[in-house]
């Protein structure tokens, strides 16, 4: 049982230390996974959900308040 506790503790420490590694200069980060970038990318598509007149842009700048979707002007 003692060896199991030691093994599980060392595994836990290995996972925690791997998660705490800072970003290394020169590596590529995946910014596309951030919600802000996803929203900016989707602003250009028709049919996205909008809640006000400023929620749409690009090819479909008009927000139809009945269906709450962006449509072409």
From Swiss-Prot:
<feature type="disulfide bond">
    <location>
        <begin position="50"/>
        <end position="63"/>
    </location>
</feature>
<dbReference type="GO" id="GO:0005576">
    <property type="term" value="C:extracellular region"/>
</dbReference>
<feature type="signal peptide">
    <location>
        <begin position="1"/>
        <end position="20"/>
    </location>
</feature>
<keyword id="KW-0964">Secreted</keyword>
<feature type="disulfide bond">
    <location>
        <begin position="56"/>
        <end position="70"/>
    </location>
</feature>
<comment type="similarity">
    <text>Belongs to the UPF0499 family.</text>
</comment>
<keyword id="KW-0960">Knottin</keyword>
<keyword id="KW-0732">Signal</keyword>
<protein>
    <recommendedName>
        <fullName>UPF0499 protein NFIA_054990</fullName>
    </recommendedName>
</protein>
<keyword id="KW-1015">Disulfide bond</keyword>
<feature type="disulfide bond">
    <location>
        <begin position="46"/>
        <end position="60"/>
    </location>
</feature>
């Amino acid at each position: 049982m003692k060896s199991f506790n030691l093994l599980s503790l060392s595994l836990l420490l290995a996972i925690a230390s791997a998660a705490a590694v800072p970003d290394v200069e020169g590596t590529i980060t995946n910014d596309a996974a951030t919600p802000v970038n996803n929203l900016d990318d989707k602003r250009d598509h028709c049919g996205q959900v909008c809640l006000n007149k400023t929620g749409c842009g690009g090819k479909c700048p008009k927000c139809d308040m009945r269906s709450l979707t962006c449509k072409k002007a």
